[in-house]
């Protein structure tokens, strides 16, 4: 039994060992005058990227032919876990590519940030495969501890320290709520395993009346609140704009991409597989509407790029929760397609922001001369913004179309209507980027330095997928359908 567990968990074990070796490497060479910053940080970045790519290969080689329960039923490997882990590792690899030159540009001697990004990726891999409330909570806490530190990693910046402190205080509060919910579920049912919980709740109507039912209801409500805080859904979004703005840009990019995949995957496992009940649909229905409306309206007033992207992220979480609210196979499939396309667009836009950071690009108005000084980058950013806005035939339109179609299929007409209206409103601030780049006369001309080769390659790949996704969406459809079936059958 132990041998099978070891083989199945070999990718995670490899990544943990690689992270520890990288930490030792960084500590040893940080005292050397020849190999210290800046070569050290870049070397750690490249080795970290290599570790992630090898982990992707190990996960791909060990593709599951059947469902496997590991470590006394605390973890599970199935098609849903497999594809989510590969997708998470690809998004982490994208972040590592973006950070190769970032620390040199910002004069940050912080190889520890790369090590912590890898460690949080390990925790997210375990989070995706968690099959027990205790295993899930431990994985979420390991991820959160890494995030608290990297949010405040720019030690000479008051904004970064403030961001880390805010995230720590509010994150600790949400983790406490999540743990309290898990303890209530255990107290009223006597089990923590997802499979056992699914058997208990099959055909069991949860209401506020009756001591046992109300206790279970409150427990699941607390778990839902803890999750919604982690994915920045309204009304638990308060921390996101300040933390996104104050954190180093590469950390903001990582916060926008990786946790969304792991937390949403975990939410699907918990609520669709174990606790599925129409009661939770109403909660996510409300959060979806609130997130879409606030994300669309609050972003209109923003002048800073990172703050606007934070509200954009909140709005997109609202769109993804449409699929969650449906509770159907089509809804889950549309949510998974939505996550994939959202991550592609977010990687793209942050790669551009990081490329322009060489000149301390901070405000949207700073884009004034981009169409004339770097027309290719301006076209790339325009395509991404049109995709964010949901302009056909780009990938962003396909994502929203499938989500709204799933909402109509399950009778959630109000959800689809509000989604369409907020999409139209969001066009204003996305297309404002294009207007500033092409039609505004800049007060001061900024000559942007050429982008490094790694980011150029990353941008080329993401823009290609965003632009031509509509021509051949079948592979993603097949993969997401398999993942949805794993949860529903």
Swiss-Prot record:
The keyword Iron does not apply. This is NADH-ubiquinone oxidoreductase chain 2. Keywords: Electron transport, Membrane, Mitochondrion, Mitochondrion inner membrane, NAD, Respiratory chain, Translocase, Transmembrane, Transmembrane helix, Transport, Ubiquinone. GO terms for molecular function: NADH dehydrogenase (ubiquinone) activity. Core subunit of the mitochondrial membrane respiratory chain NADH dehydrogenase (Complex I) that is believed to belong to the minimal assembly required for catalysis. Complex I functions in the transfer of electrons from NADH to the respiratory chain. The immediate electron acceptor for the enzyme is believed to be ubiquinone. Belongs to the complex I subunit 2 family. Its main location: mitochondrion. It comes from the Eukaryota. It is a multi-pass membrane protein. GO terms for biological process: ATP synthesis coupled electron transport. The chain crosses the membrane at residues 9-29, 47-67, 80-100, 114-134, 168-188, 216-236, 248-268, 280-300, 309-329, 335-355, 376-396, 401-421, 459-479. Its EC number is 7.1.1.2.
């Amino acid at each position: 039994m132990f041998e099978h567990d070891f083989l199945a968990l070999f990718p995670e074990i490899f990544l943990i060992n690689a992270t520890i070796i990288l930490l030792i490497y960084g500590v040893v060479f940080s005292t050397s005058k020849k190999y210290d910053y800046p070569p050290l940080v870049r070397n750690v970045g490249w080795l970290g990227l290599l570790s992630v790519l090898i982990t992707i290969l190990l996960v791909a080689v060990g593709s599951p032919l059947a469902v496997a329960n590991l470590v006394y039923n605390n973890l599970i490997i199935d098609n849903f876990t497999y594809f989510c882990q590969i997708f998470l590792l690809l998004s982490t690899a994208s972040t590592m590519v973006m950070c190769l030159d970032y620390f040199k540009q910002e004069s940050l001697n912080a190889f520890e940030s790369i090590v912590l990004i890898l460690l949080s990726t390990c925790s997210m891999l375990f989070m995706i495969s968690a099959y027990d409330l205790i295993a899930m909570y431990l994985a979420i806490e390991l991820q959160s501890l890494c995030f608290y530190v990297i949010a405040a990693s720019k030690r000479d910046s008051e904004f970064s320290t403030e961001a880390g402190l805010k995230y720590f205080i509010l994150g600790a509060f949400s983790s406490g709520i999540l743990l309290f919910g898990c303890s209530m579920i255990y107290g009223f049912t006597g089990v923590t395993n997802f499979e056992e919980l699914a058997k208990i709740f099959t055909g069991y109507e949860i209401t506020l009346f009756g001591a046992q039912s109300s206790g279970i209801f409150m427990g699941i409500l607390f778990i839902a609140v803890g999750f919604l805080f982690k994915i920045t859904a309204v009304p638990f979004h308060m921390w996101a704009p300040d933390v996104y703005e104050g954190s180093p840009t590469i950390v903001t990019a990582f916060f926008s991409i990786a946790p969304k995949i792991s937390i949403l995957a975990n939410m699907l496992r918990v609520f669709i597989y174990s606790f599925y009940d129409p009661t939770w649909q109403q909660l996510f229905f409300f959060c979806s509407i609130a997130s879409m409306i606030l994300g669309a309206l609050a972003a209109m007033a923003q002048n800073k790029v990172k703050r606007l992207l934070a509200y954009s992220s909140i709005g997109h979480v609202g769109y993804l929760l449409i699929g969650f609210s449906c509770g159907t196979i089509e809804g889950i499939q549309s949510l998974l397609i939505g996550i994939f396309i959202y991550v592609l667009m977010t990687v793209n836009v942050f790669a551009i922001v990081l490329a322009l950071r060489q000149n301390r690009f901070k405000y949207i108005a700073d884009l004034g001369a981009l169409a004339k000084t770097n027309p290719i980058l301006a076209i790339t950013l325009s395509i991404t913004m049109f995709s964010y806005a949901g302009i056909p035939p780009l990938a962003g339109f396909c994502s929203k179309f499938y989500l709204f179609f799933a909402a109509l299929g399950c009778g959630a007409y109000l959800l689809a209507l509000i989604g369409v209206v907020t999409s139209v409103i969001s066009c204003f601030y996305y297309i404002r980027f294009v207007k500033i780049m092409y039609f505004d006369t800049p007060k001061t001309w900024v000559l942007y330095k050429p982008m490094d080769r790694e980011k150029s390659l990353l941008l080329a790949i993401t823009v290609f997928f965003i632009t031509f996704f509509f021509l051949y969406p079948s592979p993603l459809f097949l993969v997401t359908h398999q993942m949805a079936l794993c949860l529903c059958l």
